[in-house]
Amino acid sequence: MQIILNARELCETDPTERIQNAVDTVFRHGGGEVAIPEGDWEIGTVRLRSNVTLHLLENAHLLGSRETEKYCYCEKSGLEPIAGTDCTDALWEPWNVRKNYDFMSKPMSRWNRGLIRAVDAVNLAIIGENGSLIDGRDCYDELGEEYYRGPHAVNLHRCENILLKGYAVQNSANWAHALFDCRNLRAENITVRAGHDGIHLTSCDNVIIQNCDFRTGDDCVAGIDNRNVEVSGCRLNTACSGMRFGGTNVTVSDCVFYGPASYRFRGSLSAEEKKNSAPSGESGGGMLSAFTYYADFSRPIRETPGNILICNCEFRNTDRFLHYNFSGNEPWQRNKPLDSVVFRNIRAEGIRLPLTFWGAAEQKGNLTLQNIRVSFAKGADCALLYLGNYGTVLLEHLTAEHLDGTCLIRKWTDDGVVRIRDCNCIGFDGVMEESATEPFACRAC
């Protein structure tokens, strides 16, 4: 079944209600498509359902309301009642005082509000034509995350067989895509501008993200406890981390990570700017890290994270291209430690800080750098790599330029094996390895 909404009926009625009624009608008839016409349509929350495609036609714009209570979703149709166990009044709290993560794990929390939502749905899609847009309009919520973040653009819980394709998201008041416990997801040809995280995956399996263009205010691709994830052909630009990610069997290929960042992290805005939904504005700062490991306690991690391959990628003007710091001073790297990560066929330019690889004493991770060409920014004056609590570290076919520190590798522990093969440090007169005597210190990402 297909319902093509027309501009007149969307103008004459509440667009949220009209779109929701169309989705429900298609769902009742076994599935199909709801098409949104060209125009600017202000909405609160639309609940997507199984076997339904939301199709944004050319220049169709879904604009999020700036009234936070428009996102207080209530199932009125009786089609798919929300279980009481999925509801909570818990609000976001800072990590160092929160008692649990109910605000995040329960789909009907205030934190999980969104423009487009789905719970326990299968075979669903959001697709867009040229010029289609989901605009969160930086909706302010004084009870939201960090006391200013509003709803996500797309929020999916426990969904399977998902296609996200062809549209743009801008100014998302929290994550552009917040996906929890989802299976079999394909996201392709999506553009994300400003806002917060581009795609954030939590406990998701079998995910493909390809040919997407991220210029975000927070991490481009993020998440923990994910399995079987492929990211390819994407462009990633941010003031935070290109990828802040934890998972098992993860491949990142043919991507470009680059700075300086196009948009500021909204946390850096003044309280008045946040309250008034001011634009994020240009950043000009560098990307903190191309790849940052992520393993907080927002939920149990099912498998040991590892078998992560990052290959055939370019890193331009990122402060560092690897940040794994399990030393204990970063709350988002304290759950399960990382087993292994491989960087292969990487060209990195404008690097300003050492790669950090600091594992757990009880599980010493393994790092491989193969076919790497790295050029440091002028005045960086640092080692290539900081090491601690490591198993096997392999540097093979590596060329380094403008390396001005006293050593290639600085080690705080001597418990692992370092193998260096065919390493060419142009103009470098320091030593290959050096043991540190000072306490370990690392700027968090």
Where are these regions (language model features)?
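Extracellular/periplasmic carbohydrate-active domains that bind, remodel
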Residues: M1-C445
